[in-house]
């Protein structure tokens, strides 16, 4: 009984201190070296040197793991290599830092479309619709990409159904 007030005060102090460290930093507090490394990675990506760009983005993340732009850049680079699943993971990391990042939401949805995961792409599009308030040009492109992929999936399903109903061709018999 005597130690209850002291224990409560100590636990409250620890809870406040731990929540302060979890809250992280704002984008403006990202290490300047990490920002410079991301810019170099972006330049390498634009020049078509994707492997080199990935190295720069990894360095940026080593300097400051809260650099959302580094995760987005890394996602773009691995997606350029055709690794859509891996890019989705990097977009997830960016969205963990800022769940309302419109660029990460839109580009992750495009990666979902490329992977054939249209339901997840639609979920991202719904989130993007609620987040986007002004310039939402990416929504039109995303909607068109989802519709096109959906039509392709339906056409492929129809072709499979048609093939199944036709069955095997009859064997020719000698007269």
Per-range role (PLM):
Residues 3, 28, 34, 126-175:
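Terminal, low-structured helical/coil segments at or just beyond the last alpha-helical repeat
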Residues 73, 107, 141-145:
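Canonical tetratricopeptide repeat
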Residues 27-28, 61-62, 92-96, 130:
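Conserved structural position within tetratricopeptide repeats
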Residues 38, 45-46, 75, 79, ...:
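Position-specific recognition of the canonical hydrophobic site in helix A of tetratricopeptide repeat
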